[in-house]
UniProtKB/Swiss-Prot annotation:
<feature type="binding site">
    <location>
        <position position="54"/>
    </location>
    <ligand>
        <name>NADP(+)</name>
    </ligand>
</feature>
<feature type="binding site">
    <location>
        <begin position="200"/>
        <end position="203"/>
    </location>
    <ligand>
        <name>substrate</name>
    </ligand>
</feature>
<feature type="binding site">
    <location>
        <position position="168"/>
    </location>
    <ligand>
        <name>substrate</name>
    </ligand>
</feature>
<feature type="binding site">
    <location>
        <position position="179"/>
    </location>
    <ligand>
        <name>substrate</name>
    </ligand>
</feature>
<feature type="binding site">
    <location>
        <begin position="32"/>
        <end position="33"/>
    </location>
    <ligand>
        <name>NADP(+)</name>
    </ligand>
</feature>
<dbReference type="Pfam" id="PF01370">
    <property type="entry name" value="Epimerase"/>
</dbReference>
<comment type="subunit">
    <text>Homopentamer.</text>
</comment>
<feature type="active site" description="Proton acceptor">
    <location>
        <position position="177"/>
    </location>
</feature>
<feature type="binding site">
    <location>
        <position position="292"/>
    </location>
    <ligand>
        <name>substrate</name>
    </ligand>
</feature>
<feature type="binding site">
    <location>
        <position position="39"/>
    </location>
    <ligand>
        <name>NADP(+)</name>
    </ligand>
</feature>
<dbReference type="InterPro" id="IPR001509">
    <property type="entry name" value="Epimerase_deHydtase"/>
</dbReference>
<dbReference type="GO" id="GO:0008712">
    <property type="term" value="F:ADP-glyceromanno-heptose 6-epimerase activity"/>
</dbReference>
<comment type="function">
    <text>Catalyzes the interconversion between ADP-D-glycero-beta-D-manno-heptose and ADP-L-glycero-beta-D-manno-heptose via an epimerization at carbon 6 of the heptose.</text>
</comment>
<feature type="binding site">
    <location>
        <position position="186"/>
    </location>
    <ligand>
        <name>substrate</name>
    </ligand>
</feature>
<feature type="binding site">
    <location>
        <begin position="11"/>
        <end position="12"/>
    </location>
    <ligand>
        <name>NADP(+)</name>
    </ligand>
</feature>
<keyword id="KW-0413">Isomerase</keyword>
<dbReference type="InterPro" id="IPR036291">
    <property type="entry name" value="NAD(P)-bd_dom_sf"/>
</dbReference>
């Protein structure tokens, strides 16, 4: 049966297409908006059966134009947390997703969609519960509002609905994202071009480079998506992070040491890298004061209770693997 991936040429979408291919699935309809044409590169090594623009897709799917569809992985959205056009954000992230979910429910199609840890915003607890959801921007609000609709819909739903609250995802196929690409991607390119990695200095009780996030490899993101794809009886909204906050220093140290290793140089500690000027700390920007999350860490209780038991890659494992992938890409 056909599988549909929206946002298929994007970061997580393209990795999902590749993950499905690795399982022998090739009857995949890719849906995206290729206004940013360079995204096509993410699909060059993937097998798909068709491509559609997002503007024509929902209406055609609701009409049943694609026959029997098993599942939709909905990764297509505006993921720019700095976007200030609320009307565009709500139309793209909320209304479009709502129409797609309704069409899936009408046809009994599994619906697996991208939510976001941005729904938690100013919270210091990251558990899938309404009391901890305090979005700070319209992107977070668009995801938050749709999650509320899902909660009201689930009791009467006759087919699977699963939302994944992605934390700080990094990994292959994100190069088109510009400023919204991961810290690992930016650290890698900064070190290659400037010979140093710059991190924020101390702020809000956290030491220099010590602000912490839940950094999760896209490899694990794909595995969790496919676990729920294989278990259509499981529905709900789930955090998708490692459950382990790590400091930005860990990202920078892993990036620099992986690049040093490729040159036959020994690994250095974070302190040694700073002493050598390979990691530098800059004053925390005034513009970000009061608007910056210094700590995120996924509560994995609900995910583990649903039966997902595989371990997650640490920064040291996942970022090193990602850097080696980046080094292998053509210039």
């Amino acid at each position: 049966m056909t599988i549909i991936v929206t946002g298929a040429a994007g970061f997580i979408g393209a990795n999902l297409v590749k993950g499905l291919n690795d399982r022998g699935e090739t009857d995949i309809i890719a849906v995206d908006n290729l206004t940013r044409a360079d995204k096509f590169r993410n699909l060059v090594d993937c097998e798909i059966s068709d491509y559609l623009d997002k503007t024509e897709f929902v209406e055609r799917f609701a009409r049943g134009d694609f026959g029997k569809v098993r599942a939709i992985f909905h990764e297509g959205a505006c993921s720019d947390t700095m976007e200030t056009d609320g009307r565009y954000m709500m139309e793209n992230n909320y209304r479009y997703t709502l129409a797609l979910m309704k069409a899936c429910l009408d046809q009994g199609v599994q619906f697996l969609y991208a939510s976001s840890a941005a729904t938690y915003g100013a919270s210091d607890t990251f558990r899938e519960d309404r009391e901890f959801e305090k979005p700070l921007n319209v992107y977070g609000y668009s995801k938050f509002l749709f999650d509320q609709i899902v909660r009201r819909t689930l009791p009467g739903a006759l087919s699977q609905i699963v939302g994944f609250r992605y934390f700080n995802v990094y990994g292959p196929r994100e190069q088109h994202k510009g400023r919204m690409a991961s810290v690992a991607f930016h650290n890698f390119n900064q070190f290659r071009t400037e010979g140093t990695v710059k991190l924020f200095g101390e702020y809000n009780g956290y030491p220099q480079g010590g602000q912490m996030r839940d950094f999760v490899s896209v490899e694990d993101v794909v595995k969790v998506n496919l676990f729920f794809f294989d278990h259509p009886d499981k529905s709900g909204i789930f955090n998708l992070g490692t459950g382990r906050a790590q400091p930005f220093n860990d990202i920078a140290t892993t990036v620099v040491n992986t690049l040093r290793e490729a040159e036959g140089k020994p690994a250095l500690s974070t302190e040694e890298l700073a002493q050598e000027g390979l990691v530098e700390y800059v004053k925390f920007p005034d513009a970000l004061r009061g608007k910056y999350q210094c700590f995120t860490q996924a509560d994995q209780g609900k995910l583990r209770a649903a039966g997902y038991s595989a371990p997650f890659l640490t920064v040291q494992e996942g970022v090193a693997r990602y850097c080696r992938w980046l080094m292998a890409q053509p210039a």
